[in-house]
């Protein structure tokens, strides 16, 4: 599927061990930074489609879902622990002139890629 890089955020605005959510060409994108490295993953948990932002956490190479606590590796999207949820979709990410750029598909995402807001 063709994809294009989009300029998303200044690198200095994503502190180490933090995450931030964006919508890029309609795609929900999670940008996480740990030990200086940037990662871009889909901002939709594969368990019950929760968004990782704003309450998710970045620790020890993984992002934790705020809804039920599933953890996914930043470098390959794999689910850690016994839960066995599907891996997170990852996007290519690069830093250019101090900006974080993320490559997302040129096609709009389907509903299966969009997060939902849990009922409270
Ligand atoms: S929705 Fe993420 S762990 Fe359940």
What is each PLM-predicted segment?
Residues 72-74, 78:
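M16/MPP (pitrilysin/insulinase) zinc-metallopeptidase core fold and M16-derived inactive scaffolds
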Residues 59-66, 79-88:
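Short cysteine/histidine-rich metal-coordination sites, predominantly Zn2+-binding motifs
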């Amino acid at each position: 599927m063709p994809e294009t890089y989009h300029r998303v955020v200044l690198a200095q605005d994503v502190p180490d061990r933090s995450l931030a959510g964006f919508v890029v060409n309609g795609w929900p994108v999670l940008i996480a930074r740990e030990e200086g490295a940037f990662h871009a993953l889909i901002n939709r948990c594969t368990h019950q489609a929760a968004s990782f932002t704003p309450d998710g956490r970045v620790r020890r190479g993984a992002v934790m879902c705020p809804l039920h606590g599933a953890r996914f590796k930043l470098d390959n999207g794999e689910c850690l622990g016994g839960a066995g949820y599907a891996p997170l979709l990852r996007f290519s990410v690069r830093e250019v002139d101090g900006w974080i750029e993320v490559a997302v598909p040129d096609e709009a995402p389907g509903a299966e890629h969009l997060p939902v807001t849990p009922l409270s």
